[in-house]
């Protein structure tokens, strides 16, 4: 096979996956603080295991938030409301252990308090944004359909159409590429938690007909292999089956491994943390580059020093698909996008009243629709064309 002929796989996880339970709790707590005080500094981490949730982190805010009650509401919304699952919204022990943000960090991210006048980055680090024109959402096909499968699966569960479904689930999609373009789905894997009183054959048939074939177009399902609950059963799941932690699904949250990742997680962090906000800006830039037709594929790297506003570097890679040089593209990006923490927050309205970061905490942060996902706008295409 040439470099343009290959097979690529990405995975996603459902809202009831233990790590995603933690992401949603952390982001729901973040939302509650920002709703009361947009200047809140939040770094909220969650751990979940058998009927136990531990919330920890650094939070400085004028807001007063009942983190335990928020956690229970999230767990209940997801569907963990039966003690026999080993994790129940009403019976779980929920403890919170938070303290104020370090003053050494605070002075660097608060305008006028650090060595530099402007609001600086909340930490050093590198962040990537990516876009590709192989789906209408400008996302790689493997991660796009992986997300859609677990999202549809959750809908089947919440609507009670498939009564045997329980909250924990994972998906994996393998796509075959010819000449760099996706031509078929080679393999689909779905593992879903279920009640004890259902036969494996029923699960397999139901998921192929009611989930896979409803999500993935028939023209892509050519000689496709299906692996449905391939261990034979999946009764013990959620935080009772595996302990969960915030920030442990960073590849699921982004591009499924198709684009690079700087290593920083998103959930539970307010927008002063460039791990989150600069990754959103990177996606915004890359998507506008591809949507403008200046490249078929684009990856943007932004890098920051703690306490410093301007990025220390901006790098672009169009993988040989660019219509203009990458040097020229960097110039146009710097001219048309605000890359300081404050500029990113203002451009993407990351502190806008009513924003719900919890919406980002399952089914990926990118390729999504809705008012929360402001980094998905393609309103810079004309400016980028010059």
Curated annotation (Swiss-Prot):
<dbReference type="InterPro" id="IPR022630">
    <property type="entry name" value="S-AdoMet_synt_C"/>
</dbReference>
<dbReference type="InterPro" id="IPR022631">
    <property type="entry name" value="ADOMET_SYNTHASE_CS"/>
</dbReference>
<feature type="binding site">
    <location>
        <position position="242"/>
    </location>
    <ligand>
        <name>L-methionine</name>
    </ligand>
</feature>
<dbReference type="InterPro" id="IPR022628">
    <property type="entry name" value="S-AdoMet_synt_N"/>
</dbReference>
<dbReference type="GO" id="GO:0006556">
    <property type="term" value="P:S-adenosylmethionine biosynthetic process"/>
</dbReference>
<keyword id="KW-0554">One-carbon metabolism</keyword>
<feature type="binding site" description="in other chain">
    <location>
        <position position="273"/>
    </location>
    <ligand>
        <name>L-methionine</name>
    </ligand>
</feature>
<dbReference type="GO" id="GO:0004478">
    <property type="term" value="F:methionine adenosyltransferase activity"/>
</dbReference>
<feature type="binding site">
    <location>
        <position position="242"/>
    </location>
    <ligand>
        <name>ATP</name>
    </ligand>
</feature>
<keyword id="KW-0067">ATP-binding</keyword>
<feature type="region of interest" description="Flexible loop">
    <location>
        <begin position="101"/>
        <end position="111"/>
    </location>
</feature>
<keyword id="KW-0963">Cytoplasm</keyword>
<feature type="binding site" description="in other chain">
    <location>
        <begin position="168"/>
        <end position="170"/>
    </location>
    <ligand>
        <name>ATP</name>
    </ligand>
</feature>
<dbReference type="GO" id="GO:0005524">
    <property type="term" value="F:ATP binding"/>
</dbReference>
<dbReference type="GO" id="GO:0006730">
    <property type="term" value="P:one-carbon metabolic process"/>
</dbReference>
<comment type="pathway">
    <text>Amino-acid biosynthesis; S-adenosyl-L-methionine biosynthesis; S-adenosyl-L-methionine from L-methionine: step 1/1.</text>
</comment>
<dbReference type="InterPro" id="IPR022629">
    <property type="entry name" value="S-AdoMet_synt_central"/>
</dbReference>
<dbReference type="InterPro" id="IPR022636">
    <property type="entry name" value="S-AdoMet_synthetase_sfam"/>
</dbReference>
<dbReference type="Pfam" id="PF00438">
    <property type="entry name" value="S-AdoMet_synt_N"/>
</dbReference>
<comment type="similarity">
    <text>Belongs to the AdoMet synthase family.</text>
</comment>
<feature type="binding site" description="in other chain">
    <location>
        <position position="101"/>
    </location>
    <ligand>
        <name>L-methionine</name>
    </ligand>
</feature>
<dbReference type="InterPro" id="IPR002133">
    <property type="entry name" value="S-AdoMet_synthetase"/>
</dbReference>
<feature type="binding site">
    <location>
        <position position="45"/>
    </location>
    <ligand>
        <name>K(+)</name>
    </ligand>
</feature>
<keyword id="KW-0479">Metal-binding</keyword>
<dbReference type="Pfam" id="PF02772">
    <property type="entry name" value="S-AdoMet_synt_M"/>
</dbReference>
<comment type="function">
    <text>Catalyzes the formation of S-adenosylmethionine (AdoMet) from methionine and ATP. The overall synthetic reaction is composed of two sequential steps, AdoMet formation and the subsequent tripolyphosphate hydrolysis which occurs prior to release of AdoMet from the enzyme.</text>
</comment>
<keyword id="KW-0808">Transferase</keyword>
<feature type="binding site" description="in other chain">
    <location>
        <position position="17"/>
    </location>
    <ligand>
        <name>ATP</name>
    </ligand>
</feature>
<protein>
    <recommendedName>
        <fullName>S-adenosylmethionine synthase</fullName>
        <ecNumber>2.5.1.6</ecNumber>
    </recommendedName>
</protein>
<keyword id="KW-0460">Magnesium</keyword>
<dbReference type="GO" id="GO:0000287">
    <property type="term" value="F:magnesium ion binding"/>
</dbReference>
<feature type="binding site">
    <location>
        <position position="269"/>
    </location>
    <ligand>
        <name>ATP</name>
    </ligand>
</feature>
<keyword id="KW-0547">Nucleotide-binding</keyword>
<keyword id="KW-0630">Potassium</keyword>
<comment type="subunit">
    <text>Homotetramer; dimer of dimers.</text>
</comment>
<feature type="binding site" description="in other chain">
    <location>
        <position position="58"/>
    </location>
    <ligand>
        <name>L-methionine</name>
    </ligand>
</feature>
<feature type="binding site">
    <location>
        <position position="19"/>
    </location>
    <ligand>
        <name>Mg(2+)</name>
    </ligand>
</feature>
<feature type="binding site">
    <location>
        <position position="265"/>
    </location>
    <ligand>
        <name>ATP</name>
    </ligand>
</feature>
<dbReference type="Pfam" id="PF02773">
    <property type="entry name" value="S-AdoMet_synt_C"/>
</dbReference>
<feature type="binding site" description="in other chain">
    <location>
        <begin position="248"/>
        <end position="249"/>
    </location>
    <ligand>
        <name>ATP</name>
    </ligand>
</feature>
<dbReference type="GO" id="GO:0005737">
    <property type="term" value="C:cytoplasm"/>
</dbReference>
